[in-house]
Amino acid sequence: MATINQLVRKPRQATTYKSASPALDKCPQRRGVCTRVYTTTPKKPNSALRKVAKVRLTNQEEVISYIGGEGHNLQEHSVVLIRGGRVKDLPGVRYHTVRGSLDAAGVAKRRQGRSKYGAKRPKS
């Protein structure tokens, strides 16, 4: 416990909020252009080929974004929408692409959890 004299000399520091997705600049999403679309491997206990894209945002920041779902139509110069949300087993990937928006098509033949993958409601 600090004494009153110590607190007079140096007041308590308020804890500063540190954003988990700083490139979004406090926006819910951001638009960007894919500069490179590639696959990468996850950290130690897991094994896969995860689809990611390097994206240059409208605020000139370059970020790595994860492309969720099975199959995608993204390539270089595709315009995508980026949201926050990291991928735990991919170091440096702190953003997700929004499927079904701009150039990123929704996941085909998706029946459950469709809203997360931009899939339309199937014709019964």
From Swiss-Prot:
GO molecular function list: rRNA binding; structural constituent of ribosome; tRNA binding
InterPro entries (UniProt xref): NA-bd_OB-fold, Ribosomal_uS12, Ribosomal_uS12_bac
Top-rank taxon, per record: Bacteria
Keyword Ribosomal protein set for record: yes
3-methylthioaspartic acid PTM positions: D89
Keywords assigned: Methylation, Ribonucleoprotein, Ribosomal protein, RNA-binding, rRNA-binding, tRNA-binding
Region Disordered, residue ranges: 1-25
Record's keyword annotation contains Ribosomal protein: yes
Family annotation (SUPFAM superfamilies): Nucleic acid-binding proteins
GO CC aspect terms: ribosome; small ribosomal subunit
One record GO biological process: translation
One Pfam family hit: Ribosom_S12_S23
Function recorded in the entry: With S4 and S5 plays an important role in translational accuracy.
Xref: HAMAP family: Ribosomal_uS12_B
Protein family: Belongs to the universal ribosomal protein uS12 family.
Binding partners and assembly: Part of the 30S ribosomal subunit. Contacts proteins S8 and S17. May interact with IF1 in the 30S initiation complex.
Name this polypeptide is given: Small ribosomal subunit protein uS12
